[in-house]
Swiss-Prot record:
Function text: Catalyzes the conversion of S-adenosyl-L-methionine (SAM) to carboxy-S-adenosyl-L-methionine (Cx-SAM).
GO molecular function terms noted in the UniProt entry: carboxyl- or carbamoyltransferase activity; S-adenosyl-L-methionine binding
Top-level enzyme category: transferase
Keywords: S-adenosyl-L-methionine, Transferase
GO biological process: tRNA wobble uridine modification
Substrates-to-products reaction catalysed: prephenate + S-adenosyl-L-methionine = carboxy-S-adenosyl-L-methionine + 3-phenylpyruvate + H2O
Protein name: Carboxy-S-adenosyl-L-methionine synthase
Listed CDD domains: AdoMet_MTases
Binding positions for S-adenosyl-L-methionine per the UniProt entry: Y40, G65, A66, S67, D90, N91, D122, I123, N137, R204
Entry similarity comment: Belongs to the class I-like SAM-binding methyltransferase superfamily. Cx-SAM synthase family.
Enzyme Commission code: 2.1.3.-
Record text on subunit structure and interactions: Homodimer.
Gene name in the database record: cmoA
HAMAP family per record: Cx_SAM_synthase
Length: 247
């Protein structure tokens, strides 16, 4: 993957545009997400480990909001269940193009990997096939809040018995002091990874109208309302967490 450093917000902007997964972001995305999301590499690699426990023969594994395919690559590294295939979906043309390049590179390096189909499209309009694993890795937070339950209901309907949804998201907190503390610690994390105060402030301005995080309680309530029977948090680092939802 690209090692180009993220300098998108390094220079003062007269007007900060809303964040978008365009070609500029795609070029620096691996660096951006590693330096911005605490625990991201751990979540991605272990998502593959978890998926291997739920994958069922002759079923689909979905990577929804696949970006550059990091989760898809983890699924292919860890899942060895017969007849499985991965469907990776993203609505950014730039992301999809680069994702296909990276996955082709993975194919050339390894044998016996799960087949993968990369689709450019809207996951809200996706025709889901019977699935044993669905990964929503930092994707739901970019979907309009009033459309989230319907999407999760459709995912639940597509899941086979014994399957799982693995949902990773940035969190907000209902307790004001807890929210302020973890927000400050997240800023400290970004500073420690080389982001300037200007970069942090401009990125916050760019993303605040685009990304709408929920609390852990809201995620649990929504997942149960969508038909899931059990919600198990398996990872949290500062204000980022990952959950397993069982049908």
């Amino acid at each position: 993957m690209s090692k180009e450093p993220d300098r998108i917000f390094a220079q003062p902007m007269a007007q900060v545009p809303d964040f978008a997964f365009n070609e500029d972001v795609v070029r620096v995305f691996p660096d951006m997400i590693k330096r911005s999301v605490p625990g991201y590499p751990t979540i991605v690699e272990n998502l593959g480990v978890l998926a291997a426990q739920f994958a069922q023969p002759n079923s689909v594994l979905y990577d929804l909001g696949a970006s550059l395919g990091a989760v898809t690559q983890a699924l292919r590294r860890h899942v060895r269940t017969d007849g499985c295939r991965v469907i990776a979906v993203d609505n950014s043309a730039a992301m999809v193009e680069r994702c296909r390049e990276y996955l082709n590179g993975q194919d050339s390096m390894f044998q016996e990997l799960l087949p993968v189909e990369v689709i450019e499209g809207d996951i809200l309009a996706l025709d889901f096939k019977p699935a044993s694993v669905v990964a929503l890795n930092f994707t739901l937070q970019f979907i309009a809040p009033d459309q989230r339950t319907a999407l999760l209901s459709r995912i639940r309907q597509s899941l086979l018995p014994g399957g799982a949804l693995i949902l990773s998201e940035k969190l907000r907190f209902n307790d004001a002091e807890e929210h302020a503390l973890l927000t400050d610690l997240h800023v400290a994390f970004k500073r420690a990874n080389g982001y300037s105060e200007l970069e942090i402030a401009q990125k916050r301005s760019a993303i605040e109208n685009v990304m709408k995080p929920d609390s852990l309680e809201e995620h649990r309530e929504r997942l149960l309302a969508a038909g899931f029977s059990k919600v198990v948090p398996w990872f949290q680092c500062l204000n980022f967490a990952s959950l397993i939802a069982l049908p």
